[in-house]
Amino acid sequence: MATLKDQLIHNLLKEEHVPHNKITVVGVGAVGMACAISILMKELADEIALVDVMEDKLKGEMMDLQHGSLFLRTPKIVSGKDYNVTANSRLVVITAGARQQEGESRLNLVQRNVNIFKFIIPNIVKYSPNCKLLVVSNPVDILTYVAWKISGFPKNRVIGSGCNLDSARFRYLMGERLGVHPLSCHGWILGEHGDSSVPVWSGVNVAGVSLKNLHPELGTDADKEHWKAVHKQVVDSAYEVIKLKGYTSWAIGLSVADLAESIMKNLRRVHPISTMIKGLYGIKEDVFLSVPCILGQNGISDVVKVTLTPEEEAHLKKSADTLWGIQKELQF
């Protein structure tokens, strides 16, 4: 007896489903799901896989997204506790880990999250040996180093979301002051994602007009307009949002989808993201910090050599020393 489906549809070939643009998100907390929905809305994947240890929450989030399939263009949304659901991913976004508590520094989280990564990373490598790893969990620079060490991947394929969001916050706040859309406000925050990030005031511009040339005190203590406060707001913003709503999610989700787009579409856009910077700016250790990187289908293919003031370079070196001080104590 022919089924309804048989009566309706005449099959022409037996297809093997192998995804070509699969993205996995590890961790279905607020950040993971914000990344997932942002990636879905940008139509970057032909399959999205979600992984977590909390099975009920995981299944619920998957179903909730599947029920929106009519409004999306990603034909397959899957999930599982077992990493076999992640097989053949081109990009794996890692958001899993202990969440930063109110008032807790990102660095304080570190050993808790290293232990989680010791389980996650080998499983990802097993099922998607050719993927790019995009680390979002905090402290992101150290955990990107941890992911690189555990995975054995070449450094171009291990990327930290880094200062992509810090720079976006900076450009938003700058735009608010000037009455200009953030896309037209150019400025870079480099170094550590977090408390010791470095604003590159010399490069801040609108339409190629250097703000530092117009206003030489820009970013200094002598500045009567207190532009330095903009960077302080960037540093404080995550803490403020956590204090108000308990966590951050939307902006980091959008930031991650922005990076995913550059990778999946091989855009070769320049982003301030965390990469291994040994050999740059006099840094001699295996540390990951944000510098402007060209991002495409192979991950980070090139780094843009930014001219920093001696003060900015010293700041970056200090960040590197702080991170290395923590990294060398880590138990793998």
Swiss-Prot record:
Residues given in the record as substrate binding sites: 106, 138, 169, 248
EC number: 1.1.1.27
Any GO CC annotation of this UniProt entry: sperm fibrous sheath
Enzyme class: oxidoreductase
Keyword NAD on entry: yes
Pfam families to which the protein is assigned, alphabetical: Ldh_1_C, Ldh_1_N
Active site annotation, chain numbering: 193 (proton acceptor)
Modified residues (N6-acetyllysine): 5, 14, 57, 81, 118, 126, 224, 232, 243, 318
Molecular functions (GO terms): identical protein binding; L-lactate dehydrogenase activity
GO biological process, one term: pyruvate catabolic process
Keyword list, A-Z: Acetylation, Cytoplasm, Isopeptide bond, NAD, Oxidoreductase, Phosphoprotein, Ubl conjugation
Post-translational modification: ISGylated.
Modified residues (N6-succinyllysine): 5, 118, 318
Binding-site list for NAD(+): 29-57, 99, 138
InterPro entries: L-lactate/malate_DH, L-lactate_DH, L-lactate_DH_AS, Lactate/malate_DH_C, Lactate/malate_DH_N, Lactate_DH/Glyco_Ohase_4_C, NAD(P)-bd_dom_sf
Phosphotyrosine modification, residue list: 239
Pathway info: Fermentation; pyruvate fermentation to lactate; (S)-lactate from pyruvate: step 1/1
Phosphothreonine modified-residue sites: 309, 322
Catalytic activity: (S)-lactate + NAD(+) = pyruvate + NADH + H(+)
NCBIfam families cross-referenced by the UniProt entry: L-LDH-NAD, PRK00066.1, PRK06223.1
Functional description taken from the UniProt entry: Interconverts simultaneously and stereospecifically pyruvate and lactate with concomitant interconversion of NADH and NAD(+).
Family: Belongs to the LDH/MDH superfamily. LDH family.
Name of protein: L-lactate dehydrogenase A chain
Gene this chain is encoded by: LDHA
